[in-house]
Amino acid sequence: MEFSWGSGQESQRLLLSFLFLAIWEPGNSQLHYSIPEEAKHGTFVGRIAQDLGLELAELVPRLFRVASKDRGDLLEVNLQNGILFVNSRIDREELCGRSAECSIHLEVIVDRPLQVFHVEVEVRDINDNPPTFPTTQKNLFIAESRPLDTWFPLEGASDSDIGINAVLTYRLSPNDYFSLEKPTNSERVKGLGLILRKSLDREETPELFLVLTVTDGGKPELTGSVQLLITVLDANDNSPVFDRSLYTVKLPENVPNGTLVVKVNASDLDEGANGEVMYSFSTDISPNVKNKFHIDPVTGEIAVKGYIDFEECTSYEILIEGIDKGQLPLSGHCKVIVQVEDINDNAPELEFKSLSLPIRENAPVGTVIALISVFDPDTGVNGQVTCSLTPQVPFKLVSTFKNYYSLVLDSALDRETTADYKVVVIARDGGLPSLWATASVSVEVADVNDNAPAFAQPEYTVFVKENNPPGAHIFTVSAVDADSQENALVSYSLVERRVGERLLSSYVSVHAESGKVFALQPLDHEELELLQFQVSARDAGVPALGSNVTLQVFVLDENDNAPTLLEPEAGISGGIVSRLVSRSVGAGHVVAKVRAVDADSGYNAWLSYELQSSEGNSRSLFRVGLYTGEISTTRSLDEADSPRQRLLVLVKDHGDPAMMVTATVLVSLVENGPLPKAPSRVSTRVTNAEASLVDVNVYLIIAICAVSSLLVLTLLLYSALRCSTVPSESVCGPPKPVMVCSSAVGSWSYSQQRRQRVCSGEYPPKTDLMAFSPSLSDSRDREDQLQSTEDSSGKPRQPNPDWRYSASLRAGMHSSVHLEEAGILRAGPGGPDQQWPTVSSATPEPEAGEVSPPVGAGVNSNSWTFKYGPGNPKQPGPGELPDKFIIPGSPAIISIRQESANNQIDKSDFITFGKKEETKKKKKKKKGNKTQEKKEKGNSTTDNSDQ
C-alpha cells in the first residue's frame, strides 16, 4: 500500500506562497537571485554590479560592500568583476528550517554618494535529506479484543526538505491484519496509523513484525523505514479518550515559570487500573517544547517551564498522550496549540550604517551625513518605530525607506560658532507603554577659511620721539582669525607705497609673525611729522583672506635745533647788524629788530630775546622785546651817550635743555640831520607820499600779473603731473578734521581746524606754513607752498629778507604755538588761567576760517591772519592803504591812515610782505642810477618795516 501526503496544512502554505510570489514579484524593485542549496564554493549567483547599474571601476572607490543580517559569510562579491558568488556551504534546512520560503537578504551599500540596494537571494531546496522516523523500531501492544477497523497511531517520518521533496509516501510490508491509514482532516488530528482489518488471535499470532517504508517525492527518491513490533495483548479493550482532540490556547510572552497553560482531560471506560489515565508528551515532541512546558502526569495540567518569547517562536504544537494503567495499556491522543501573544517587551535597536565625517562647515543643506537603521523585534504597533533628534541641532532625519533613516544637514553650519555637535537619535515604538532607545554620534565640523583676520580697531595712533635708534620697536599690531589651524595662521606685511621719493619700507618694517613694527632709521620731526601707512594681515588658508589696519605715526619733536638768525639785509652776516640812530629820537624809538627762526616746533621753537650787557654799551639806554626781538630806546638820547653802542642779544628757545644763539647789534649815534640810508619817517612822509602811491600801484599791478601767470603755470604743471603719474596717498597726514599737535608738555587735538601741508614728489613736505579752516571737508585745493628752512646739507638756508613777518611766527605757527597758548597756557595743568591778547585782522569781525595768533607768547606781532572763504567785502582800491596796521610788540590795532599836515600818506607806515616787496626791489634795480632816489626810499621803507 502507498499513500502520498505532506500534511494538508503544508500543502496550503506552499500553494499560498507560490500565489504570493506570482503576484508580488513583478512589482518588486529589489534584485532577486535564486541558487540551490549545497552549492559549491565559487558558484555563480549573479552579476550584481551590472544589475545594480554600477561600473566595475567605481566599486572600490565607492566602498562597495555587502551587509547581511543572516550569516554574512555565505555569499561574497568579487570587486574585480562584480560577480556575486557562493562563499561557503548553504544548508537550507539549517538556515530556514521548514519554512516554505528561504531567502538570504543582502544590503549593498556604496558611498559617494551614499546608496543602499536590497538584494534577495532565494535558496532553492534540493532533495538532500531522506525521510527519517524518530526511532528505528516501534513496539505496539494490541489487545486481541480490539475490534476491526481499530486505528492504531504511528509516529510518522519527517523530512527536512520542503515542497515536493517533503511529500512522503508510506508503504507497509504485506500482511493480513493491518493496513495504513492517512489523515482524514486538514488539522492532522489523526496522523499515520494502522487499521486492524482482521481480528487478532494471540494464540495464533502473538507477535507481528512489519516494516514501514517511507519515500519522499524528490528526484531521485530517498527512503526510510522503521520496524513495527506488534505484540498482541489480552483484555483492556478501551483506550483513554480526551474531551477534545484539539486544544487552542493563547499565552502572553514573558509569563513567569509555573503559569498554567491548559488542563487536558481523558476518560477511560474501563474500570480499575485499566481506567486510570496517565498523561505525557508524545515521544516525537520536539526538544524545544520539552524545554518550555511541563505536564502533570496525574492531573494533565500543562504549565510554563521556560522563557516564552514571541520573537523566538510564535506558536507551539504539543502532542499529548493519555495511557491507562491496564496490563495492556491503551492510549489516547490530543493536540494542544499554544499561540504566543506579543507584548511590547523589546526596545528599538539603532545602528549607524555609514558615517561621512567630518563635515565641512560650507556643506550645502541636504548633505547626507549618516545612514541609520532601526529594528524592533515586536509586531504590530509594538514594532512600529519612529525616530527623532534632540533639539537645537542643525540636522534632521529623513525616512528613506522602511526601517532606514538618513541624517541630513538641515541648516548652514558655522564652525566658529559651534565646532562639533553631539547628535542623539531617539527611536520610540508604538507600544503602550512605549519603549525607546537612543544612539549618539559626534559630528565634527571641519573648518573652511571663511573668516579674514580682524584687527581690534581700524586705525591706531602712535607717538614716536624723533632721533630714535635704528630698528626701534614702535608698535605691535595684532589680528585675530576666528578660523582654526592653518586658516588661522596670520602673517603681517606692509602695504608698500612711496613716501616722497622713498619707499615706505625704507622707513618702517613689520615682523611677519609677531606683528611688531620697527623704525628702520632715525625719524626727523622737521622732515616728517606724520607717517601714515597700512599693515596687511593675511591668513594661510586657500584662498587666503586678509584685512588692513592704518597706523598714524606722529613724530614728536625734540629740541635738537638751535635758533638761527635771519640776515636782515644782503651782504651782512655773522649775526652783526649795524644801525644809525639820530640823537634826537625819543624814548620807545625802534632802533633795530633781531629776527631768528627755530626749525623745531612747539615750545622748542618758541623764541625769547634778552639783551646782554657787554663792554661799551649802556644797558639802560636800550631794551629788547621779550618775544618780538625789537630793540628800542628806553629814554631820549643826549650828547653824553657814547656814539657807538654794541648790543648783544641772546636768542633762546624754550626747549629742555634750552638752546640759544647770540646776535650783535652795532648802533651808531649821529647828530641831527638826514641819515644816509635811514631817512626819518616824518621827512619821508612829507616828501615822498605821491611817489610812493604811484610806485605802489605799479608794483601791485606787476605783482598781480606775475602771481596770476605763476598760478596758471602751476595749475597746468600740476594737471600734467596728475595725469601722468599714479596717485599715491599723501604723506601730509590723515584727512581727519582733527589736528594733533605735539610739544614738550604733551599732545592735544584742536577741533574745527584742518592742517594744510604742502607735499612735493621731489622734496620732503614743506613745513613753513600752516593754514586753518573751519571746514571739515577733505578738499586740498588751497595748499600753501613755501621753501624748506633747511637744505640737504643740514645748514639753515638764507630766508628772503623781504618777508615782513617774524620767522619765529612761522615756527610758532608751524608748531601750533598759538594753540599751546590758547589751550595749554590758558588752562594747562599747574598753571594760572592766562588770557593772551590776540591780534585781530583789519575786518570789524573775524570772518569764517580766520585765526589770529596770540601776541606776546612767542609769536611775532607781525603775524598776519590766514583765511579762506569770503573776506571783508570792503576792498581797498588802487593806491589805497589798509585802514589798520599791526604795531610790532603791541596787542593794539593802530590805524595807519593818519592824515599829515599836507594830507598825504607816508609810505613808511605801510609794511609790505613777501613777493610784492621783492617785485618792487627788482623793478627798482632795473631803473638803475636814474631811480637811485626811489631805491633809497624803498630801502628806507624796508628798514622801517623791520623795525
Swiss-Prot record:
Residues 30-697 are extracellular. One of its GO terms (cellular component) is synapse. Residues 719-947 are cytoplasmic. Disulfide bonds join 96-102. Residues 761-805, 824-853, 897-947 are annotated as: Disordered. The keyword Chaperone does not apply. Pfam families: Cadherin, Cadherin_2, Cadherin_tail. Glycans are attached at residues 257, 265, 548. Cadherin 1 to cadherin 4 domains mediate homophilic trans-interaction, the interaction with an identical protocadherin expressed by a neighboring cell. This is a head-to-tail interaction, the cadherin 1 domain interacting with the cadherin 4 domain and the cadherin 2 domain interacting the cadherin 3 domain of the other protocadherin. The cadherin 6 domain mediates promiscuous interactions with protocadherins on the same cell membrane. Each cadherin domain binds three calcium ions. This is Protocadherin alpha-4. It comes from Rattus norvegicus (Rat).
